[in-house]
UniProtKB/Swiss-Prot annotation:
Cofactor (UniProt): Mg(2+); Mn(2+)
Protein name: Isopentenyl-diphosphate Delta-isomerase
Enzyme Commission number: 5.3.3.2
Binding site for Mn(2+): H27, H34, H71, E119, E121
Disulphide connectivity of cysteines: none
Pathway membership, UniProt: Isoprenoid biosynthesis; dimethylallyl diphosphate biosynthesis; dimethylallyl diphosphate from isopentenyl diphosphate: step 1/1
Species of the source: Corynebacterium glutamicum (strain ATCC 13032 / DSM 20300 / JCM 1318 / BCRC 11384 / CCUG 27702 / LMG 3730 / NBRC 12168 / NCIMB 10025 / NRRL B-2784 / 534)
Length: 189
């Protein structure tokens, strides 16, 4: 029995792919720049899925964050990677998403957690609509707990207590275009 190794795509400072490395070896105190994605999932009522990272996670354990993050594999589009992670992380079906919009295509961040582990990612941010009748059943090793939040209430909580949330969520939600896209999607419901 063989286990497939999840690879992440490494990047140079210009955002060009320069190779791959096993995901298990990438996140260290000297993390190389690599490709990732970040998602904000809206249910049919226009509420945002906010997740609390599993306590067993290597980086930022137990921290509240956006709906889902991940890494596209070699030759995998972000949309395909989002669908894959929706299955692997949130227990969704591969066709659970109605719409995947890239809102912040050039988002990049570097953050260091309390243990010294670095996240350094080219990480486009996506807004995703969940189909009617779909239910989130997160895997325990990925998500400790989750909540569906009205967007403005989440924005207010992030503004008042940013230390409760992941640094990438706080930074991403400081972008007016992301907040606007989320509010427009919420108001459309």
């Amino acid at each position: 029995m063989t286990t497939e190794v999840e690879l992440v795509v490494l990047a140079d400072s210009e955002g060009n792919p320069i190779g791959t490395a096993p995901k298990a070896t990438v996140h260290t105190k000297d993390t190389p720049l690599h490709f990732a994605f970040s998602t904000y999932i809206l249910n049919p009522r226009g509420e945002l899925l906010v997740t609390r990272r599993a306590l067993s996670k290597k980086t930022w354990p137990g921290v509240w964050t956006n709906s889902m993050c991940g890494h596209p594999g070699p030759d995998e589009t972000n949309a395909d990677a989002i669908r894959r992670r929706g299955v692997d992380e949130l227990g969704l079906e591969v066709d659970s998403f109605l719409d995947i919009q890239e809102i912040l295509p050039d988002y990049q961040y570097r953050a260091v957690d309390a243990s010294g582990i670095v996240e350094w990612e080219l990480c486009p941010v996506h807004l995703v609509r969940l189909a009617v009748g779909e239910f989130v059943e997160p895997l325990d090793d990925e998500v400790e707990e989750f909540e569906w939040a009205e967007p403005q209430k989440l924005f207010d909580a992030v503004d008042a207590t940013p230390f409760v949330f992941s640094p990438w969520l706080v930074d991403q939600l400081s972008a007016p275009e992301l907040r606007q896209a989320i509010l427009e999607a919420f108001d459309a419901e």
